[in-house]
Amino acid sequence: MIDVNKFESMQIGLASPDKIRMWSYGEVKKPETINYRTLKPEKDGLFDERIFGPTKDYECACGKYKRIRYKGIVCDRCGVEVTKSKVRRERMGHIELAAPVTHIWYFKGIPSRMGLVLDMSPRSLEEIIYFASYVVVDPGDTPLEKKQLLTEREYRAKLDEYGNRFVAKIGGEAIQALLQSVDLEKEANLLKEELKEASGQKRTRAVRRLDIIEAFIKSGNHPDWMVMDAIPVMPPDLRPMVQLDGGRFATSDLKHLYRRVINRNNRLKRLLDLNAPGIIVQNEKRMLQEAVDALIDNGRRGRPVAGPGNRPLKSLSHMLKGKQEGFRQNLLGKRVDYSGRSVIDVGPSLKMNQMGLPVPMAMELFKPFIMKELVSRNLASNIKNAKRKIDRKDEEVYDVLEDVIKEHPVLLNRAPTLHRLGIQAFEPVLVSGKAMRLHPLACEAYNADFDGDQMAIHVPLSNEAQAEARLLMLAAHHILAPKDGKPVVTPSQDMVIGNYWLTMERAESVGEGMIFNDLDEVKLALQNGYVSIHTRIGVRASSMPEKPFTDQQRQQILITTAGKMLFNDILPKDFVYLNAPTNEKLVNGTPDEYFLEAGEDIHEQLNQRPLLSPFKSGFLSDVIAEVYKQYKVTETSLLLDRMKDLGFYRSTLSGLTVGIADITNLPDKPAIIAAAHKKVATVTKQFRRGLITDDERYERVIGIWNDAKDEIQQRLMDTFDPQNPIFMMSDSGARGNISNFTQLAGMRGLMAAPNGKIMELPILSNFREGLSVLEMFISTHGARKGMTDTALKTANSGYLTRRLVDVAQDVIVREKDCGTDRGLLITAIAEGNEMIEPLYDRILGRYTMKSVINPETGKVIVGQNEMIDERSAQEIIDAGIQEVTIRSAFTCNTAHGVCEKCYGRNMATGDRVEVGEAVGTVAAQSIGEPGTQLTMRNFHTGGVAGNADITQGLPRIQEIVEARNPKGPAEISEVTGVVESIEEDPAEGTKEVTVKGETDSRTYSLPITARMKVAEGDYIHRGAPLNEGSIDPKKLIKVRDVLSTENYLLSEIQK
């Protein structure tokens, strides 16, 4: 037999009866399994040692031959070969069937393979196979036709009429005879002839039949092998009987299914020997057919065979299907040694590439390493002794453990692993307790928090694995997210509020206008209370020689605050001095406006200057990205740790708290609400008089309340004290946003009903005042829907990611340059007035197809085939260029992948992508990972009649990726030309849109409720949508070309 442990790939095919018998080591004749007293396998049964091999290594069944020296001998008493018991995992048996039986996969699969080969409907096949109708196999010289079905009564009548001049059969034998009579070559030729004329359904069927028939010719399989004379029996160790405590046995379902087949087969043999009446034999044959069906695929036809407790039995097919099956559970996803899992806790004192490992876990995970080290240090005489020492928890074991885990990275993983940042490597540090400690900045990549999350830990054993973990997977390397190249390790929550508080400016605080020599003096003054963190002070610029100030600035006094000096102290020495949170300061240095000439009056200047805003979360992220770009990994991870420590320390010192008094009342609120009530009354009056429809009234009411809420929100924003802790939290990006705030202090606003429609009744109260009973009840709908949506969408999103990875995993960067001469013209993606993705983001990190030239100066900004970096991308935008031709994966010529130039920058490193990078998987994960955040709702536009629901969120992504026919499709024009007329036909409920092209004109009929995207007299191109909705990509490909369809899909997904 083949070596079952070494294989490259698998394929499912047909086995001939001879092949099945060749595989087999003997025939299983009895349904018995093991003897209930001796627990030894029964002879000729499903566990027979003569067929499948010995149950104990190198020992025959009767015990005459024991030990390895008799290897290969077949015992003369019991007939068992003396060999390893492992052969029971690979030796098959077989069952000789007393009547041929069809294979359910080939009869029931879609499309039915048997039906296609025989050109018969599955319906009639079923009647033949399950003994409801006879089929004419050979009409002889009678007027009957081949493959004609006859009922029992018709068959008897024809027998009386024609005698044995024709042959008709029933059951598996009939199908076998028909399949044996198929001449494949002749059928194929006939079909090819037919394809020349046929069209429509006939053609489709002919193509399908030709496919199957040519496949049979090519593979050399015979169609009649779809009917089985013998069936293989799976090796017994793959369907074992396990003894439970209490002497009972747990058996595999296959045992029951095989037993049913063997029992019915033996009964059929006996009936045939007895020459039993035909009807009894037929019934037994049908039962055998059903038993074999159940064994191969239980439940595919009729009711599944159930075991104890009415549970359907798991058949052979079920063992290959789904998540729990053989492939995904055992072959592709094995459990691994040297792994553990535990609850995680925050480790604020850890470095970027460290994790805290509890001592008991470390002891267990690194046991072999500790044992080896104990022996090599002569602290233990042998391995057994070393093991005993570990179990006794001797003192010296801990010293060894400390040394063993040094420089030995471990992998941490948190389920669900949605993208490659879900597994990262850290260096372990021993901690007390039983919880693992995770670095606070690693949380975002894992999407972890400390409310009881658990994580798994794995120890890479070999030197290669350790090296790979250290070089490629260390958490310090994963600073940018592979999906968009933005930092994934930005400080959050406490760290943000700490840095925000630190960089605030406050007018007229203690010591305002003092001038200092250098940072040390500032620190001293801070300690002694001469200045506060937020005091605006002056510092000699020359005290910071490394900073990139201009020569003129170096002579001057820099106006800043003590807090900002502390913040700048954590940045690299020669990095720009940050005084205000704006991006151009990051790139272009500190502006002159923050400097004073030596003799100027600082107090006068300070009175004129506005207060600068503090550093928010987004700005911190930009700082990190900029530092990463200039200084790469090491410096960035050091900066991150310093920023984390500073943030935690300062947020503690700030003493930021939230009390009920921080939620302010809005005096204007009653007036705004009264005005809204008045407007609603007016609208209702108009409706009562019949001036507007009910839908219009609903729309307007919703609009009125939304406006009222927005106005309250705006007033709240205006009246806020910048020192208000809640405002600081939301403004800095630490926690919460403005709408939380409006709900606390303004009004909650409109809520959605369970069906997703917005209710007209707004919640006027806020949480500070408290909700009335009715308001409380209304607002619970939304909360419940949110919970159910989240649960459903996780599963859907995970499945989508899996399918995406499946199709994209072989897209790899294969070469440096494919030399294509095609590219893509890129513009910003916008929908109406809303910018979805600006041009800057789309061209950054891509290679140009043609040189980009400044239209005014004629200067070449980027040459041909060069990468567009941040600086040149900004230049292109500043020059007012709206579109750029770039290299794209859509137009890449590389076979089975893409080339470096067409792909562009590797987002995770900010450098060129390297050959061998698995960009397909990265792309699939980047779409799949945010999938969980997308909504499940099919968006209902506030009830305007006829704007068919346009699908959005996760369902829309699935629709696009699978090229389904979209819901609420948009009609597209097939010609380029002018929209001649748009006529409504109320009787038919349609709109007729006529587009006049250069050569011909086309008329499209749309539902009368459709929202138009074109008006009469518009000039449109082919493929342009006429009404709002989603374009069907299959139509677009017919009208335009592949490239424009790819572009459309791309822009849709980006939304």
From Swiss-Prot:
Its EC number is 2.7.7.6. It comes from the Bacteria. Zn(2+) 2 binds at residues 818, 892, 899, 902. Zn(2+) 1 binds at residues 60, 62, 75, 78. One of its GO terms (molecular function) is metal ion binding. Binds 1 Mg(2+) ion per subunit. Binds 2 Zn(2+) ions per subunit. Mg(2+) binds at residues 449, 451, 453. Keywords: DNA-directed RNA polymerase, Magnesium, Metal-binding, Nucleotidyltransferase, Transcription, Transferase, Zinc. Coiled coil: none annotated. It catalyses: RNA(n) + a ribonucleoside 5'-triphosphate = RNA(n+1) + diphosphate. Gene3D superfamilies: 1.10.132.30, 1.10.1790.20, 1.10.40.90, 2.40.40.20, 2.40.50.100, RNA polymerase II, clamp domain, RNA polymerase Rpb1, domain 3. GO terms for cellular component: DNA-directed RNA polymerase complex. The keyword Protease does not apply. GO terms for biological process: DNA-templated transcription. The keyword Membrane does not apply. InterPro entries: DNA-dir_RpoC_beta_prime, DNA-dir_RpoC_beta_prime_bact, RNA_pol_asu, RNA_pol_N, RNA_pol_Rpb1_1, RNA_pol_Rpb1_3, RNA_pol_Rpb1_3_sf, RNA_pol_Rpb1_4. Its cofactor is Mg(2+); Zn(2+). Belongs to the RNA polymerase beta' chain family. The RNAP catalytic core consists of 2 alpha, 1 beta, 1 beta' and 1 omega subunit. When a sigma factor is associated with the core the holoenzyme is formed, which can initiate transcription. DNA-dependent RNA polymerase catalyzes the transcription of DNA into RNA using the four ribonucleoside triphosphates as substrates. This is DNA-directed RNA polymerase subunit beta'. The lineage of its organism: Bacteria, Bacillati, Bacillota, Bacilli, Lactobacillales.
